[in-house]
Amino acid sequence: MSPLVAVLVFFSAALGVPGPGVAGNPRGLDAIFEAPVTPAPPTRHPRREELEWDDEDHPLLDLEPPVGSRCHPYIAYSLPPDMNAVTSVVVKPYCSPPEVILWASGTAYLVNPFVAIQALAVGEPLNEAALKELGEVAVHKDSLPPLRYNGGPPAE
């Protein structure tokens, strides 16, 4: 499968667009490119705010799933056990709520992704110490809208 086809399949699944020939959407992926663009929400300086936590000590914030994930893209979730190494962390501090995007690959053991997520989302300077649990990762900060608004991960 070519990289372009893989990206299109990922976005069709993430957006809930059925494939070609599926009842209700015979055009398949064409619908993605005709969909209206949703503007990014206004910023409220979310990195200065406290995170909310659920009953299982997971932060309540939006996480974009790594490419190939079957997780829902708009809710917080624990990383599935087969995604146990992180090679890139993208922090979007100007989103409301803040978004931390993890790309997982390899077989290294991931101790606790939520420790790093909380530190990245609420720390004033980027807390590099929290990333030590993740091993060697690339960290990027930007001011672009959330991925669900601008259509995908950054080029590598």
UniProtKB/Swiss-Prot annotation:
Regarding how it is modified after translation, the entry says: O-glycosylated, and sialylated.
Query: Keyword Flavoprotein on this protein?
Result: no
**Disulphide bridges, residue numbers:** C71-C95
- Which InterPro entries does the UniProt entry name for this protein? Herpes_gL_N, Herpes_gL_N_sf, HSV_GL_alphagamma
Q: What is its main location?
A: virion
Q: Which UniProt keywords apply?
A: Disulfide bond, Fusion of virus membrane with host cell membrane, Fusion of virus membrane with host membrane, Glycoprotein, Host cell membrane, Host Golgi apparatus, Host membrane, Membrane, Signal, Viral envelope protein, Viral penetration into host cytoplasm, Virion, Virus entry into host cell
One Pfam family, please name it.
Answer: Herpes_UL1
What does the subunit comment say?
Interacts with glycoprotein H (gH); this interaction is necessary for the correct processing and cell surface expression of gH. The heterodimer gH/gL seems to interact with gB trimers during fusion.
Please explain the role this protein plays, according to its UniProt record. Answer: The heterodimer glycoprotein H-glycoprotein L is required for the fusion of viral and plasma membranes leading to virus entry into the host cell. Acts as a functional inhibitor of gH and maintains gH in an inhibited form. Upon binding to host integrins, gL dissociates from gH leading to activation of the viral fusion glycoproteins gB and gH.
Name this protein carries in UniProt: Envelope glycoprotein L
